[in-house]
């Protein structure tokens, strides 16, 4: 009985590890963030403050370094919700 519970626990943990990275937490009332690669930032993005400064100059409210080996400066803004009302 103990080994079957351990097996079930292990399988559940593995399923969570596989499924969790693809999940997004949606908080009601907060807009989704849209991201685009900065047009003016050059080189590897190592300092998020300099990335943010460049993104602000491009008209975005925020910017962050994104990536692990190949860091890029990514500018972010709240996504516009399209209204379907006429």
Curated annotation (Swiss-Prot):
Disulfide bonds join 34-79, 45-65, 51-73, 55-75. The modification Pyrrolidone carboxylic acid is found at residue 30. The keyword Ion transport does not apply. Transmembrane segments: none annotated. Pfam families: Gamma-thionin (PF00304). Keywords: Antimicrobial, Disulfide bond, Fungicide, Plant defense, Pyrrolidone carboxylic acid, Secreted, Signal. SUPFAM superfamilies: Scorpion toxin-like. One of its GO terms (biological process) is defense response to fungus. Gene3D superfamilies: Knottin, scorpion toxin-like. PANTHER family: DEFENSIN-LIKE PROTEIN 1, DEFENSIN-LIKE PROTEIN 7-RELATED. This is Putative defensin-like protein 9. It comes from Arabidopsis thaliana (Mouse-ear cress).
């Amino acid at each position: 009985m103990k080994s079957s519970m351990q097996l079930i626990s292990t399988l559940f943990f593995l399923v969570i590890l596989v499924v969790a990275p693809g999940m997004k937490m949606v908080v009601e009332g907060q807009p989704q963030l849209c991201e685009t690669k900065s047009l003016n930032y050059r080189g590897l993005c190592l300092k998020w403050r300099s990335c943010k400064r460049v993104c602000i100059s491009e008209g975005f409210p925020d910017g962050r370094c994104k990536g692990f080996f190949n860091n890029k400066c990514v500018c972010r803004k709240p996504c516009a919700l399209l209204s379907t009302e006429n």
